[in-house]
From Swiss-Prot:
Entry annotated with the keyword Repeat: yes
The PPR repeat ranges on this chain: 165-199, 200-234, 235-269, 270-304, 305-339, 340-374, 375-409, 410-445, 446-480, 481-515, 516-546, 551-586
Pfam families tied to this protein: PPR, PPR_2
Protein name: Pentatricopeptide repeat-containing protein At5g40400
Organism: Arabidopsis thaliana (Mouse-ear cress)
InterPro entries (UniProt xref): Pentatricopeptide_rpt, PPR-containing_protein, TPR-like_helical_dom_sf
Family: Belongs to the PPR family. P subfamily.
Origin organism lineage: Eukaryota, Viridiplantae, Streptophyta, Embryophyta, Tracheophyta
Transmembrane segments: none
Domain of life: Eukaryota
Keywords of the record: Repeat
Amino acid sequence: MKNLVSNLRFFSSYSSSIVPRCSNIPKPILNPLYNLLPQSQNPSKIVDVICSTLNHSDYSVLLPNLRDEVKSLIPHLGYPEISRVLLRFQSDASRAITFFKWVKFDLGKRPNVGNYCLLLHILVSSKKFPLAMQFLCELIELTSKKEEVDVFRVLVSATDECNWDPVVFDMLVKGYLKLGLVEEGFRVFREVLDSGFSVSVVTCNHLLNGLLKLDLMEDCWQVYSVMCRVGIHPNTYTFNILTNVFCNDSNFREVDDFLEKMEEEGFEPDLVTYNTLVSSYCRRGRLKEAFYLYKIMYRRRVVPDLVTYTSLIKGLCKDGRVREAHQTFHRMVDRGIKPDCMSYNTLIYAYCKEGMMQQSKKLLHEMLGNSVVPDRFTCKVIVEGFVREGRLLSAVNFVVELRRLKVDIPFEVCDFLIVSLCQEGKPFAAKHLLDRIIEEEGHEAKPETYNNLIESLSRCDAIEEALVLKGKLKNQNQVLDAKTYRALIGCLCRIGRNREAESLMAEMFDSEVKPDSFICGALVYGYCKELDFDKAERLLSLFAMEFRIFDPESYNSLVKAVCETGCGYKKALELQERMQRLGFVPNRLTCKYLIQVLEQPSLPNHLPEN
């Protein structure tokens, strides 16, 4: 087959005599008795009946009704009959596609691979490429998991029977790539070329790009080698892809050879090519190669631009060589190239990462002096840098300074700083910053920010301020989270405001926020502090029975309080028995408290009788 069709690469064929016939479609076995039947009931006439309907001017209307008219013949419509109908209409793609869809959808029969391939040849030779690609992708999906089916071979075999155009084989490779089956596409690509057919440079580029994304560098070079061997001329896009392949796969000493090869192919390496190479090397930490290319650019009279220098600066920063990066930055400025926000951000980020905040601020002021507007990233990395260094007040002052200079600061940066202040136990500074932002810009903080602020104020026992914020959230119909309730209830119990803590717990229940062992412990602590042991016991019972929360720390707090107040061993023992009936299990600490109360001199000399 390879020898017979090797010179069919670039032209269409409308003769089935060029390729040897392989008689794909079996001839029907005719029974003489069938001729005694009416045509609509004669199995040997099913193809004629269908074709007669298709030849009618109203075929699209008549064909759907044909199923009922020839109902008895439908079981005799097999794959060979479908193929014969398609072949009769190979010069009329509209009727062929109407018939194919009728078989598939109205009759519910699934055409086989051979039927699909005949239809594809008909559509491609009729120049109906989008429709052909649709059915081609459908065929690939049907056969992609069947190793025994080779769509390419069936397509080649089908050329014996009908008009065809070699572009169908190019489309076959594209179809696999379109469906993301890159490795299968590569296999078919080799099959197509080994059989003497051609593939377009556009398809080759798609294949190269797919293989590059899969990190299959050797296969990329194989594709390029085959392209050169069979005479498919690469274009600009080909070399752009190969540039990326080269950066991933090659040694920098081969750069000159690669660039010379590009020139031999008539492709002049330009600034974009060099920038792609430099950027790729810098991203992979291959700075020696990147600077080698930077020198080659001058030798070849290609002047590096802002993109080149930014890539080099970024590579040096990534390697921890911040001072060298800054020197490269100065060299760029000295050569008349004006830095942009990205080049400044690269250096600022590197200095922040090294904890050199003064240098970062200095660069920011330099940006403003050069009329380069800082973006979200600039503000974010500097604020995060101050926070990482534990210099939260410096971060606040920095934000205030930027606002004074009319620099737009993203609210999420301020939000991050507010939360950081809360986590560091500085809720008043956080609240002051939030109030200022709301007053000046009208931004409203997220519920999570308010929750963090309430928690921080509660931890500092600033309960009044915390309750004001909590009321604000409730007025906005926002639900407090469990952490916020924990902080508020814990604070109220700590400062002896147990009734308010109880009200908050009831509010939790109404809001369907489940309490936890911390809230149980906080309330037990508050009740014990007031010597209200009965209430503490009732609370433990409520949590055990309603929420299945058996908190040993809360239980031990109550036992300890009972023992330390001189209530006597008998009362402590009775409490323990009641708790055990609820499901509480005494531990070593419980036993320790009971033993301590037993050893107190004020106790009677004998234990109570059982």
